[in-house]
A protein has these predicted regions:
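Sec-dependent signal peptide recognition
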Residues: 2-10
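Hydrophobic h-region of N-terminal signal peptides that target proteins for export
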Residues: 10-20
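Cleaved targeting-peptide boundary
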Residues: 19-27
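A short, Trp-centered hydrophobic/proline-enriched beta-strand micro-motif
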Residues: 32-50
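Solvent-exposed strand-loop boundary residues in beta-sheet-rich modules
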Residues: 48, 91-93, 148
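An acidic-aromatic
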Residues: 53-105
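Flexible, surface-exposed loop/linker segments and immediately adjacent secondary-structure boundaries
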Residues: 90-127
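Gly/Pro-enriched, hydrophobic low-complexity segments
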Residues: 114-184
């Protein structure tokens, strides 16, 4: 009888421990957990009185590097790391370097996302709520309200999970020696 009770207790303990530590993650949660790099074309829509639409390419790499290359309607490059943001505007011959006050880089947002009942993922960082939707097992759209309370929707296409990306692309190197560099 004692042996039976010991076996029963072990089985109960094992089932309780398993229930508290579910090892099954959704496909999307697996992607987020193992994401080390990401590349995609994007369409960014800023919804206000007159919607603004931008197109470009995003390349991001853990732990916190991102390069947003805007191609239309104006060319712009945004380099992000854990310390600063560099916004290079070739048409203005200007690069603006700003210290990053808050951890709002692409990977920080992705790592903090929590799955919602509707299947989307959400997180709030510094009073900004980010919502990510997956499609076909890959990030598809990211929504948030900017500091002016405009809704921003970024839709990804041709997304690649964990592509090989060289570290050098995340370092701003002036392409023209005549540009103004502004430190804020």
């Amino acid at each position: 009888m004692k042996a039976f009770l010991k076996i029963l207790m072990v089985l109960v303990f094992t089932s309780v421990a398993h229930a508290k530590n579910p090892s099954t993650l959704s496909k999307e949660e697996e992607v987020l957990q193992h994401l080390q790099s990401f590349s995609a074309h994007f369409k960014q829509v800023l919804k206000n009185e007159k919607p603004l639409v931008y197109y470009g390419v995003l390349k991001a790499k853990a732990p916190n590097w991102a390069l947003w290359v805007y191609e239309k309607p104006l060319k712009k490059e945004i380099y992000m790391n854990d310390k600063e943001v560099v916004i290079y505007e070739p048409n203005l011959f200007q690069a603006t370097i700003t210290p990053l006050k808050d951890k709002t880089d692409f990977f920080t947002i992705l790592k903090r996302l929590k799955k919602q009942d509707d299947g989307s993922f959400k997180t709030t960082i510094n009073k900004t709520t980010y919502r990510l939707v997956f499609k076909d097992g890959k990030p598809f759209s990211l929504e948030f309200k900017d500091e002016m309370n405009n809704l921003v929707t970024i839709t990804f296409s041709q997304a690649e999970i964990n592509p090989t990306i060289a570290d050098e692309i995340f370092v701003f190197k002036p392409k023209d020696e005549n540009i103004d560099i502004v430190h804020q």
